[in-house]
């Protein structure tokens, strides 16, 4: 029997760095550092895929040599597909982490600043109301004192 190591036949080809999976796209920011990080992650996943193809069939081929069942080749293809799916999930996970780690966009930072300013405005409004109430009470006390002094002056 001649066993050549070849990638499994799959209807879903593995993504290469230029062919990103659906939903994965470069960040909107033109930062070369972020693009390089994304390319590094994609290269890592591609390396995982490339590393599996020669190794897994070699192990499985030993089992095939011992057993003449045709189902072993199907097992090799199934293991390879499972690995490819895991590599894609890993890629998506790392891409999600990268999005979380990136700096917030201008719109996000402006929304955050607006929320902070609105909270500060509420606090200052409450302080102004409190001081206005205290000022009005002080005015009332001063008027009462003035009336009291006028009454005393009229008596004299």
Curated annotation (Swiss-Prot):
Q: Which InterPro entries match?
A: MED28 (IPR034456), Mediator_Med28 (IPR021640)
Which domain of life does this protein belong to? Eukaryota
Q: What is the effect of changing residue 44 to S?
A: Loss of oligomerization. Loss of oligomerization and dimerization
| Locations listed in the record | Nucleus
Instruction: Show the segment(s) annotated as Disordered.
Output: 1-38
Protein task: Component of the Mediator complex, a coactivator involved in the regulated transcription of nearly all RNA polymerase II-dependent genes. Mediator functions as a bridge to convey information from gene-specific regulatory proteins to the basal RNA polymerase II transcription machinery. The Mediator complex, having a compact conformation in its free form, is recruited to promoters by direct interactions with regulatory proteins and serves for the assembly of a functional pre-initiation complex with RNA polymerase II and the general transcription factors.
UniProt family annotation: Belongs to the Mediator complex subunit 28 family.
Name this polypeptide is given: Mediator of RNA polymerase II transcription subunit 28
Q: Which species does the entry assign this protein to?
A: Arabidopsis thaliana
């Amino acid at each position: 029997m001649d066993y050549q190591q070849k990638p499994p036949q799959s209807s879903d080809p593995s993504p290469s760095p230029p062919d990103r999976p659906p939903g994965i796209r470069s960040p909107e920011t033109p930062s070369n550092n972020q693009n390089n990080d994304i390319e590094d992650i994609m290269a890592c996943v591609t390396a995982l895929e490339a590393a599996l193809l020669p190794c897994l069939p070699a192990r499985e081929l030993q089992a095939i040599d011992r057993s003449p069942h045709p189902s072993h080749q199907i097992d090799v293809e199934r293991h390879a597909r499972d690995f490819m799916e895991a590599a894609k999930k890993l890629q998506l996970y790392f891409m999600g982490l990268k999005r979380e780690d990136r700096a917030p966009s201008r719109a996000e930072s402006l929304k955050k600043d607006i929320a902070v300013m609105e909270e500060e405005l509420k606090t200052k409004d409450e302080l102004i109301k409190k001081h206005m109430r205290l000022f009005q009470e002080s005015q009332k006390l001063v008027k009462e004192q003035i009336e009291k002094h006028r009454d005393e002056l009229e008596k004299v």
